[in-house]
Amino acid sequence: MQNTTLFILATLLIFCPFFTASAWSVNNFLMTGPKAYLTYSASVAVGAQNGIEECKYQFAWERWNCPESTLQLATHNGLRSATRETSFVHAISSAGVMYTLTRNCSMGDFDNCGCDDSRNGRIGGRGWVWGGCSDNAEFGERISKLFVDGLETGQDARALMNLHNNEAGRLAVKETMKRTCKCHGISGSCSIQTCWLQLAEFRDIGNHLKIKHDQALKLEMDKRKMRSGNSADNRGAIADAFSSVAGSELIFLEDSPDYCLKNISLGLQGTEGRECLQSGKNLSQWERRSCKRLCTDCGLRVEEKKTEIISSCNCKFHWCCTVKCEQCKQVVIKHFCARRERDSNMLNTKRKNRGHRR
């Protein structure tokens, strides 16, 4: 995890000098050049990593489970596909960067940034006025756009798709913000309230974008235009296609491959060997169906394995001042996707035959 974060940070610093100083002056920043980017780069790296971790959570029991190869987005080797899943990776990574920058700004981690008090004193609605310390989402959005969108240098349909989904991620941060209020009045009568906007939990943003992923729109596009945006005609046609979609919606251009199957060229491991859930407390219906989705619907069987877990238990405090625990063993039953026995036997036979030929 730490190595991944450092790799993201190093790559961002490599690409940062391509931003122009004029872009910074427009936004009234106190610094220009590489120093300014260094100020925010640590937050950007953490935000990108948080986005990937949220992706793994949201897709933990899906056939595509946000594998490590998705980090190619942050390192700008490029997610070559333009699938529904790619759209989510761009959106959640962009949201993660904006979220972390906004939160760090409100916490006073940056010298040139603080709370958003631009609306303070204005009447917000019946019985309440704007006040307090609103999270500065505008700042987070602006810096996130410079860093994340700045990595997208192409002009073809795939590049525009990535930029659109980056923006959808930032909009998700703003759309999920919550109004928090404090009451004022004699003896707590709450005759008037002072309210401010706060960031939602990042899990709420992940849930929001997961729904957007499930409802993502496919844009039908000429494959030649997807690869080439150089001509004015191509750029115009691509721009027209994108303009019909709301900025908060996720879009994709290509159908997803079969994630049941292993495909080395695409970096897909398939679902064989994946764990699934059949029983347990507080499982959602989606989680309970994971064995069907990952195993049986992919032509695999569900294999039951018993695992022994050793953990501390019956801990007691002894004066003074130690805690002594017993070591307890617990057998846990887990379920995994495995090949059907007939398929495994056929595979073993083929391997033996190859061995004899050698």
Swiss-Prot record:
Signal peptide: 1-22
Gene Ontology cellular-component terms listed: collagen-containing extracellular matrix; extracellular region; extracellular space
MF (Gene Ontology): cytokine activity; frizzled binding; protease binding
Biological role stated in the UniProt entry: Ligand for members of the frizzled family of seven transmembrane receptors. Plays a role in ventral mesodermal patterning during embryogenesis. Mimics Nieuwkoop center activity. Causes dorsal mesodermal differentiation of animal cap ectoderm when coexpressed with noggin and nuclear, sequence-specific DNA-binding protein xBra. None of these molecules causes dorsal mesoderm formation when expressed alone.
Family, similarity comment: Belongs to the Wnt family.
GO biological process, one term: Spemann organizer formation
Protein name per the record: Protein Wnt-8
CDD domains assigned to the protein according to its UniProt record, in alphabetical order: Wnt_Wnt8a
Disulfide partners: 55-66, 105-113, 115-133, 181-195, 183-190, 260-298, 276-291, 295-337, 313-328, 315-325, 320-321
Keywords for this protein: Developmental protein, Disulfide bond, Extracellular matrix, Glycoprotein, Lipoprotein, Secreted, Signal, Wnt signaling pathway
Gene3D superfamilies per record: 3.30.2460.20
Lipidation (O-palmitoleoyl serine): 187
SMART domains, per the entry: WNT1
Subcellular location: Secreted, Extracellular space, Extracellular matrix
Post-translational modifications reported in the UniProt record: Palmitoleoylation is required for efficient binding to frizzled receptors. Depalmitoleoylation leads to Wnt signaling pathway inhibition. Proteolytic processing by tiki1 and tiki2 promotes oxidation and formation of large disulfide-bond oligomers, leading to inactivation of wnt8.
Subunit description: Homooligomer; disulfide-linked, leading to inactivation. Interacts with the long chain of cer1.
Pfam families: wnt (PF00110)
Matching InterPro entries: Protein_Wnt-8A/8C (IPR034312), Wnt (IPR005817), Wnt8 (IPR013301), Wnt_C (IPR043158), Wnt_CS (IPR018161)
Marked site: Cleavage: 39-40, 42-43
The gene coding this protein: wnt8
